[in-house]
């Protein structure tokens, strides 16, 4: 930094110290300027919080957001273009309904209803994905650009104005000790910065209809999401009502108990005692697997939907390596590692605390 630059920094620091400690008054700008500055400050805070809250609105689970951010960062490091989508709650609920609907089978009215509801929830998850993309592209991204460009530029002008104001006030109070030419230059630079800052704030506030348009797009996207969701749910309601009508009209079946003890030798596994055969209902279990490291056993099949997840089949023994959060584990199977939901497995040997 040049000697002139060092002197200017000293002047600013000295004036700021005088105002903060000694209570000296600096040059006051007009009320119209101060009001514009206040609105810019509020807009800055509003944009920052809107960005945060809008993301929470679309992706409410902080654990999933953290996991998603980690997976997408890993994808960028690896040079992969495809990113991992947020697991919508409707989709997770739909997967649960479909899984148990299939287990109950086609002869279960409740199972068939679960399949209907599960498919509808999956459709709603797809609609929610579309909402996410629409809001991000047409509301969040423009707000981010507003924060990074327009508001940042205004902030730069205001910061420069404050520095020149301090330099001007310092020299103004020392008239006679400082050459008139320096005071004149300080006045000119102060007025120049004020005009730049004032014009940038004025133009921004006059064109705030752009932000209104972006907000309108956000509301339109949310409305479209709710309309489509309503149509899906109304269709599901009709299907379920139809199943209720079918179930109510079908003939009732009578319960017929089956005897446990029979008098006929049915299989070689039956035990005979005093001429009566008893059907053995107990099967010998295989030898238990010896495990000496953290592991779990799969209760159901798990098909990975996102990159980084570990797929497995019912009955697989998975080595546990880490617990991501209360909902997700990390483990290894057949040399592959990845994440999987805790409610799909039963822990056999827990991870060390």
From Swiss-Prot:
PROSITE patterns: BAR (PS51021), SH3 (PS50002). It comes from the Eukaryota. One of its GO terms (biological process) is endocytosis. Residues 180-201 form a coiled coil. Keywords: Coiled coil, Cytoplasm, Endocytosis, Endosome, Lipid-binding, Membrane, SH3 domain. Residues 60-87 are annotated as: Required for dimerization upon membrane association. GO terms for cellular component: cytoplasm; early endosome membrane; glutamatergic synapse; presynapse. It is a peripheral membrane protein. Pfam families: BAR (PF03114), SH3_1 (PF00018). Residues 291-350 form the SH3 domain. Belongs to the endophilin family. This is Endophilin-A3. The gene is SH3GL3.
């Amino acid at each position: 930094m040049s000697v002139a630059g060092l002197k200017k920094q000293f002047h600013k620091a000295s004036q700021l110290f005088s105002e903060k400690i000694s209570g000296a008054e600096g040059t006051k700008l007009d009320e119209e300027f101060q009001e514009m500055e206040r609105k810019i400050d509020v807009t800055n805070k509003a944009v920052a919080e809107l960005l945060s809250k809008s993301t929470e609105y679309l992706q409410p689970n902080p654990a999933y957001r953290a996991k998603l951010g980690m997976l997408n960062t890993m994808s960028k490091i690896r040079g992969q273009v495809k990113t991992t989508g947020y697991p919508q709650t409707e989709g997770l609920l739909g997967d649960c309904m479909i899984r148990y609907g299939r287990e109950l089978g086609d002869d279960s009215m409740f199972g068939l209803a679960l399949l209907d509801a599960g498919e509808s929830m999956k459709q709603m998850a797809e609609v929610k994905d579309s909402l996410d993309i629409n809001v991000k592209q047409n509301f969040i991204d423009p707000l981010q650009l507003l924060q990074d460009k327009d508001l940042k530029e205004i902030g730069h002008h205001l910061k420069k104005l404050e520095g020149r104001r301090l330099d001007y006030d310092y020299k103004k109070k020392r008239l006679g000790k400082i050459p008139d030419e320096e005071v004149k230059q300080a006045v000119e630079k102060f007025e120049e910065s004020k005009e730049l800052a004032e014009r940038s704030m004025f133009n921004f506030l006059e064109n705030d209809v752009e932000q209104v348009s972006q907000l309108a797009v956000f509301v339109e996207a949310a409305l479209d999401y709710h309309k489509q969701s309503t149509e899906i749910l109304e269709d599901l309601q009709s299907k379920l009502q139809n199943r209720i009508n079918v179930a109510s009209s079908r003939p009732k079946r009578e319960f017929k108990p089956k005897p446990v003890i029979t008098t006929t030798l049915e299989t070689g596994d039956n035990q005979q005692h005093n001429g009566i055969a008893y059907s053995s209902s107990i099967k010998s279990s295989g030898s238990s697997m010896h495990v000496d490291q953290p592991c779990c056993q799969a209760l159901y099949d798990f098909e990975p939907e996102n990159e980084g997840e570990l797929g497995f089949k019912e009955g697989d023994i998975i080595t546990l390596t880490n617990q991501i959060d209360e909902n997700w584990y990390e483990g290894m199977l057949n040399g592959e590692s990845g994440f999987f939901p805790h409610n799909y497995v039963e822990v056999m040997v827990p991870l060390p605390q």
